[in-house]
């Protein structure tokens, strides 16, 4: 049974953020099969609707049974029944913020608007000391979203990403909610021996 405190509906000036439902599988498939959208994400584009349905079930639908969570379908207000993206906080000690958005919606500030709304909901719900996010150094626009919602870059590390089997340098961003401002979660720093601190200016 789904928990009503998990992923409560949110509205912003241009967006509706809601839970995914099984009927969203075709729209999610369109997003997950786009090679450009998924270029910097840690999975290959999905090939079939069945794969998208499995992704939807495992990463979204099944998670709504837990006590709290923030795993949203991002919809335009004028078309609330069709997701154009997703934004979520992953379970685990990193409290990692992740997101994806279809290409026709890029460069309009929509993901910043969605991510900011989720961060504010996390603050209202309480319980998380900080949020983190990472982006491939070759994808600085994703880092722009992180900066726009108040995150700052704390360090960079190199990781071999599965299943793509590629070495990637990631910038690690953090936003402290209840921790002191200078607190840095070092989980990725400690688990990846190739790491450094960049002068990124943010």
Could you describe each region identified by the protein language model?
Residues 20, 48-50, 63, 165:
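A short hydrophobic/aromatic micro-motif that marks alpha-helical segments and, especially, helix-coil
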Residues 1-39, 71-202:
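Acyl-donor (CoA/ACP) binding surface of acyl/acetyltransferases
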Residues 36-58:
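Conserved GNAT-fold acetyl-CoA-binding loop/helix
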Residues 59-73:
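A short helix-loop-beta-strand connector motif used in the catalytic cores of GNAT acetyltransferases and
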Residues 44-45, 68-69, 162:
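Sparse recognition of residues in long alpha-helices and their boundaries
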Residues 32, 41, 63-65:
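Hydrophobic residues in alpha-helical segments
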């Amino acid at each position: 049974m789904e928990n009503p405190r998990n992923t409560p509906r949110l509205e912003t000036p241009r967006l509706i953020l809601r839970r995914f439902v099984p009927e969203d599988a075709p729209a999610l498939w369109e997003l997950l099969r786009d090679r450009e959208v998924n270029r910097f994400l840690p999975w290959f584009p999905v090939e079939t609707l069945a794969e998208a349905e499995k992704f939807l079930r495992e990463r979204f639908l099944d998670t709504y049974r837990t006590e709290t969570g923030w795993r949203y379908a991002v919809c335009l207000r004028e078309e609330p029944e069709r997701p154009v993206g997703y934004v979520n906080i992953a379970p685990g000690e990193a409290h990692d913020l992740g997101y994806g958005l279809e290409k026709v919606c890029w460069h309009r500030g929509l993901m910043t608007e969605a991510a900011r709304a989720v961060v504010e909901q996390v603050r209202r719900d309480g319980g998380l000391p900080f949020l983190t996010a990472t982006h491939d150094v070759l994808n600085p626009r994703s880092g722009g979203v992180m900066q726009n919602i108040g995150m700052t870059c704390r360090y960079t590390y190199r990781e071999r990403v599965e299943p793509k089997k590629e070495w990637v340098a990631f910038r690690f961003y953090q936003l402290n909610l209840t921790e002191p401002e200078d607190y840095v979660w070092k989980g990725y720093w400690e688990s990846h021996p190739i790491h450094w601190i960049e002068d990124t200016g943010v």
